[in-house]
Amino acid sequence: MLIFEGKEISTDSEGYLKETTQWSEALAVAIAANEGIELSAEHWEVVRFVREFYLEFNTSPAIRMLVKAMANKFGEEKGNSRYLYRLFPKGPAKQATKIAGLPKPVKCI
């Protein structure tokens, strides 16, 4: 659990939101700060993309799926592991989904 703007936000033991409806962009900034990330325009592009992916497919993308989907939408320059790890060094699928207020991807350790 975390406290944000005076409200209790329910999280699992790793800090992923239990209720995706509690997410907001302001909360994303706070979660990112806890992860040691200051959100840039590039980060937001990935975070929003991951949320759209979740809403469409009802699952958080694991890294391979994320890379492939990013490449399809944004091209090879952004749809590759190196680019995504530069933005999310502890794991793009893990950190991007956590910041996006989504459940941990199933295939993440």
UniProtKB/Swiss-Prot annotation:
* Key words of the record: Cytoplasm, Transferase, tRNA processing
Q: What protein name applies here?
A: Sulfurtransferase TusE
Q: What does the UniProt function comment say about this protein?
A: Part of a sulfur-relay system required for 2-thiolation of 5-methylaminomethyl-2-thiouridine (mnm(5)s(2)U) at tRNA wobble positions. Could accept sulfur from TusD.
Q: What is its EC number?
A: 2.8.1.-
Transmembrane residue ranges: none
Q: Where in the cell is it found?
A: Cytoplasm
Q: Does the keyword tRNA processing apply?
A: yes
Signal sequence segment: none
**Gene3D superfamilies in the record:** 3.30.1420.10, DsrC-like protein, C-terminal domain
Single GO MF descriptor: transferase activity
Catalytic positions? 108 (cysteine persulfide intermediate)
- Gene name of the record: tusE
What biological-process GO terms show up in the record? Answer: tRNA wobble position uridine thiolation
A Pfam family per the record: DsrC
Family membership, please give it: Belongs to the DsrC/TusE family.
Q: What is its main location?
A: cytoplasm
Give the EC class as a word.
transferase
Q: Which organism is it from?
A: Salmonella typhimurium (strain LT2 / SGSC1412 / ATCC 700720)
User: What does the subunit comment say?
Assistant: Interacts with the TusBCD complex. Interacts with MnmA.
